[in-house]
Amino acid sequence: MRGEWQEFKTPAGKKYYYNKNTKQSRWEKPNLKKGSNLESNAKESQTERKPTFSLELVNGWHLIIYNDGTKLYFNDDSKEFKNDISQEDDSRCRSLIESLDKEKLVLLIGVARGYTMREEDIDKILESCNEEIHLFKRNQDEVERKDEISEEAGDVKSPLQESHTGLVSGYGSSSGEEDEEEDEEEDEENEEQIVNQDISIIDDLNRIDTDDIDERNIFFELFDRYKLDKFSTWSLQSKKIENDPDFYKIRDDTVRESLFEEWCGERSGNATAEESDSEDNSEDDSEVLEPTKYHYLAQIVANAGTIAPDTIPQDIRKQQKALYKAYKIKEYIPSKRDQDKFVSQLLFYYKTFDLEQRKEIFCDCLRDHERDFTGAVESLRQDKELIDRWQTLLKAPADSSSIEDILLSIEHRCCVSPIVVTEPRYYVVGILEKTVVWVRWLAAEVGPSSRFTPVGAGNEPINPE
């Protein structure tokens, strides 16, 4: 498609068109004029391109982000523009670019292209980027200063060494015994200095290791105290704890994020170990709770934040790379092709329908498969005490693992896995919303069967190969 229009396909294969200017979608193909209009549109788009954000780097370089999402590097001294800066062009500037938080730069590009954010949030992102640049410059200056001091110390030491060598070689025969005694004393002093330096270095290393362990423990306690969601992303969960003083005991957000991912993996491992222990102690192996095939991949899509009309599965994989690894998506779905195919179908629902509409689509899915749930639905509905306990847990600020346990328990008792393995509608909401709708449906709180049938939703099965 040309100009302001983009063409997309639903999972069912039906085409629809998205207007980048109005942010609206339509089924009908727009009437596009050819010829001179295409050239004028191209010229117009070029003249409309304006710088939106500018970050001052080093050595006269600036990173400029334009309103169409493109970025260029401009040098004040040479007045030249570059699409990229290589090590050969400027190694220091290249190192700075690689050290910047890519997630923040992506957000700035998104805002430049029209993504809506609060002004104070944009200011925080810019302030954080400038702080990263300032810290990089300060660290580089310290490294250069230490190098200069080392070179100066080497220059001062060299004449002394040469002088000492000259004395030993020129006058050693005339004052032999005195020189030998002095040499022995100097050797002993040097050995003591070396030993003391080694002890000092070991103490420093031990202190560094202890500091790292302390910071790790502080952050793990912080995550536990605020009951962060181990199935969510750092960009979302960090907002819950950024006002706590302990949050700033580590200034590097990359280190914070790596600790969060480590905490998520450890908590997931602990949960698995507990399930394994209970499984060993239980005589009934049928109570082992296993998630459905697309359980975690669907949750990654649910946690992806704002999904743009042109988002593709590869974008989700790149943005959520850490979660793909943490939740071992490859073990559940070995084929990347099948992973992307499933994500592509979910993206259609997330682009086309809001959360409330997707909840209704999920509820329709439950109604359609009610007879397939092996009669367990009626049995659960009669267990009022269990449903009341679930509702109480959902109303309270329960942690994510408790909510997931409810969902897995329902799915296990209803034998959901073989039924929904090829049903995309079952995955159009996240774990929390899915659990809430399940419990409300079992409690018969969702009202009469008012069906929501989205046009072109393409409720075809996933059909993984």
Swiss-Prot record:
The modification Phosphoserine is found at S150. One of its GO terms (cellular component) is U1 snRNP. Residues 28-49, 144-198, 266-288 are annotated as: Disordered. Its main location: nucleus. Residues 160-175 have a biased composition (Polar residues). One of its GO terms (biological process) is mRNA cis splicing, via spliceosome. One of its GO terms (molecular function) is RNA binding. The keyword Transport does not apply. InterPro entries: FF_domain, FF_domain_sf, Prp40-like, WW_dom, WW_dom_sf. Residues 176-192, 274-288 have a biased composition (Acidic residues). It is found in: Nucleus. Residues 212-266 form the FF domain. Keywords: mRNA processing, mRNA splicing, Nucleus, Phosphoprotein, Spliceosome. Component of the precatalytic spliceosomal complex B. Interacts with PRP19. Present with 1310 molecules/cell in log phase SD medium. Component of the spliceosome involved in mRNA processing. This is Pre-mRNA-splicing factor URN1. It comes from Saccharomyces cerevisiae (strain ATCC 204508 / S288c). The lineage of its organism: Eukaryota, Fungi, Dikarya, Ascomycota, Saccharomycotina.
